[in-house]
Amino acid sequence: MSLDSITRTIDESVGGFFEPIATWLGDVIFYAVDINGAEVPLIVAWLVIAGLVFSGWFGLIQFRKFGLALRVVRGKYDEKGAEGEVSHFQALTAAVSGTVGLGNIAGVAVAVSIGGPGATFWMIICGLLGMATKFVEVTLGVKYREMHGDGTVSGGPMHYLPKGLAERFGAGGAKLGKVLAVLASAMILFFGLFGGNLFQVNQSYAQLTAVTGGEDGLMGSSGGALLFGIVIAALVGVVLLGGIRSIASVTSRLVPAMAVIYVAACLLVITVNITAVPAAFERIIDEAFDPVGVAGGILGALIVGFKRAAFSNEAGLGSAPIAHSAAKTRHPASEGLVALLEPFIDTVVVCTMTALTIVIANPPSLSEARAGESIGGVTITSDAFETVLPWFPYVLTVAVLLFAFSTVLTWGYYGLKAWTYLFGRSRASELIFKVLYTVFAVAGSLLTLQTLIDLADAVLFTLAVINIIGLYLLAPVVKRELSSFLQFVRARDRGTDTGTGDAEPETGEDAMTTTR
């Protein structure tokens, strides 16, 4: 039996196994109600309301404290001897590496092809609202993190849900928190294996195949797919052995470089077509509010935009707190402020750049995808760049590979923490997960794009339901932590240090932020 037939059999078997699961879970999670002829998934309302509630509760903190967040990430308020494994900046880049990935490249293309250019506007709105949600969950992640004897840290919803709810509501809260923690861990583990691993490998392989001659090229065979998966799995396995310090060391160098190169390339395409920019913005705004536009007009664009933005920035899912919990700090809210920069970088900056590039270039593959003749994805983005720079798909291939690699690394860490919460923290347990994770990386190069999108979307939003319930219940805790940190900031700015004491009443602008 040839290698091609073996890999084809594996592809068909794995795809046949997961496709029914993806369809069933998608039907449950994306249950929709009909409003004026447009189907509105209830999960979209869940995410929108969460972002609105937290934005109002904390006085639009994503705008009012944006400057403070930048000062914190630069280390202005660092304290010697603070517990943790990595700096604010390293924690941010590790978390960003899990969000700035193929969702920004392939996901945006899918959003524009399904929801039209108007989906871009709603993606930006989702990103801005998600900043407040991210602040809440990361603050909780740091407050209730677990410090181990070897200096390592464990955090995330599997820790702040049981501890926080027990602290606030006693025995009843402890029971509810435990149930939510187990469910959240299962979802993080599931999404880590599929959305954070398989999807990334699948799309990066698709791009590599496209620039090496397509299905008839060097990497077009099943053997090429298997080889690619094995190489990625080996690289991921090596880095995962070093834990969050190793991952942060890689991402703190890789993420800034990737972002700068990618945004610069987008700006080049936009600059070459500078005369088309006003029309592109006009089209985005018009179609965002077009009552009879693409895929259901306003509602269609909003639904697609929010779905893709959530897939990209992960606000409210409980994943980012796992990385941020490792930050060296005595003030949970300080890392929460750092975390609110994530959706801004991921969605407001990078996703917008990708969307503008696609809308301005308007490659033929976009029209084909909107007509339902192809799935689209990373190929649309690649074709958009190629309209200006014929050789750029090769550069994009490198960017896609690096984006995917960093995302797979971070989600490997997230998945490991979920795994050890469920099955115990031991060398044997961790080794089993790492082997399993690398095997899934190999499988990622053998699955179809549509199955991956459906399954990853469903798992992603299931996690959002579980986590946001906990965020609502624990929001008062976050308010107190913010008040305490702002007190510390004022003391530091005055040249004094009041320690970490209890929160005191706020005045002026800070009071407006922390008492709403």
Features from the language model and the residues they span:
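Extracellular loop-to-transmembrane helix junctions
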Residues: 36-65, 113-153, 347-353, 457-470
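Helix-loop-helix module between adjacent transmembrane segments
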Residues: 54-55, 96-97, 126-153, 162-202, ...
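Transmembrane helix-loop junctions in multi-pass membrane proteins
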Residues: 57-62, 104-108, 193-205, 215-217, ...
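Flexible loop linkers connecting adjacent transmembrane helices
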Residues: 61-88, 110-112, 116-120, 132-176, ...
